[in-house]
From Swiss-Prot:
Record lineage: Bacteria, Pseudomonadati, Pseudomonadota, Gammaproteobacteria, Enterobacterales
Sites where the protein binds S-adenosyl-L-methionine: 35-37, 55, 79, 101, 108
Coiled coil: none
Name the UniProt record assigns to this protein: Ribosomal RNA small subunit methyltransferase H
UniProt-listed GO biological process terms: rRNA base methylation
Sorted UniProt keywords: Cytoplasm, Methyltransferase, rRNA processing, S-adenosyl-L-methionine, Transferase
A Pfam family this chain is assigned to: Methyltransf_5
Reactions this protein catalyses: cytidine(1402) in 16S rRNA + S-adenosyl-L-methionine = N(4)-methylcytidine(1402) in 16S rRNA + S-adenosyl-L-homocysteine + H(+)
GO CC list: cytoplasm
Protein function: Specifically methylates the N4 position of cytidine in position 1402 (C1402) of 16S rRNA.
UniProt EC number: 2.1.1.199
């Protein structure tokens, strides 16, 4: 079934170019998806190069297993655990680049059975790994109204969060929702002011998906681990699709691109300054898709690519 879904990789060349591939380097594709980035990385690696790919979606793992290449290996799990995967392979401090393509993929959105989209009726699931954790339906049926409202406000930036949360709880009390269409209809009715350019359920579906998959915590943990696993000169190449993701990536790169914060006039010896350490990253800027790419793939419109390099500090 998954073969029916065409996936166009956003900022493909730019993200891989951002890694500054060395033929004998060791790289991580933390979000394999349908393998667009991985295949391009492999095409630039020599015989001694290695690529470790990660994904928690069983369908992505099935696609990855069709790649018959001794330089390539796939791990079924969350990219937040990349530090553990690298340590298990005795590669701490030896990784030359990490690529992350954040958020939900087009095949996940387009497959109604995954439950990510309000445009297609399917089971109210939304899990990137359907074998683990609570589905969206299970969480919405058991969560408190205040908790649902908080999630909608925090992860969906939904201004009618309280009103929608109340409607969800009332509907589940009458008859538990199990379908995406049911949730979309409840949200539409509960939303007093409609945006003519956006479906009223857009923010709710984003928020519930982020919560169910712990997406922002996943990003924060992966970024934290990256400093430990990257070799000096190793690159981070990260694509975000909405402001919540990009804010985390931008803040991480900014904070780790600064040197030690020492109050002006505080007397310190050279030895003391060395112990404080220097900046750990050098931010190399950001890129956004061009008009041609957006025209071919409208989902690329909100994407942002940020690149940074590990320093010797």
């Amino acid at each position: 079934m998954m073969e029916n879904y065409k996936h166009t990789t956003v900022l493909l060349d730019e993200a891989v170019n951002g890694l500054n591939i060395r033929p004998d380097g060791i790289y991580i594709d933390g979000t394999f998806g349908r393998g667009g980035h991985s295949r391009l990385i492999l095409s630039q690696l020599g015989e001694e190069g290695r690529l470790l790919a990660i994904d928690r979606d069983p369908q992505a793992i099935a696609v990855a297993k069709t790649i018959d290449d001794p330089r390539f290996s796939i791990i079924h799990g969350p990219f937040s655990a990349l530090g553990e995967y690298v340590a298990e392979r005795d590669l701490i401090g030896k990784i030359d680049g990490i690529l992350l393509d954040l958020g939900v993929s087009s095949p996940q959105l387009d497959d109604a059975e995954r439950g990510f989209s309000f445009m297609r009726d399917g089971p109210l699931d939304m899990r990137m790994d359907p074998t683990r954790g609570q589905s969206a339906a299970e969480w919405l049926q058991t969560a408190e109204e205040a908790d649902i409202a908080w999630v909608l406000k925090t992860y969906g930036e939904e201004r009618f969060a309280k009103r929608i949360a109340r409607a969800i709880v009332e509907r589940n009390r009458e008859q538990p929702m199990t379908r995406t269409k049911e949730l979309a209809e409840v949200v539409a009715v509960a939303t007093p002011v409609k945006d003519k350019f956006k479906h009223p359920a857009t923010r709710t579906f984003q928020a519930v998906r982020i919560w169910v998959n712990s997406e922002l915590e996943e990003i924060e943990q992966a970024l934290k681990s990256s400093l430990n696993v990257l070799a000096p000169g190793g690159r981070l190449s990260i694509i975000s699709f909405h402001s919540l993701e990009d804010r985390i990536v931008k803040r991480f790169m900014r904070e780790n691109s600064r040197g030690p914060q020492v109050p002006a006039g505080l007397p310190m010896t050279e030895e003391q300054l060395k112990k404080l350490g220097g900046r750990q990253l050098r931010a190399l800027g950001k890129l956004m898709p061009g008009e041609e790419e957006v025209a071919e793939n409208p989902r690329a419109r909100s994407s942002v690519l940020r690149i940074a390099e590990r320093t010797n500090a």
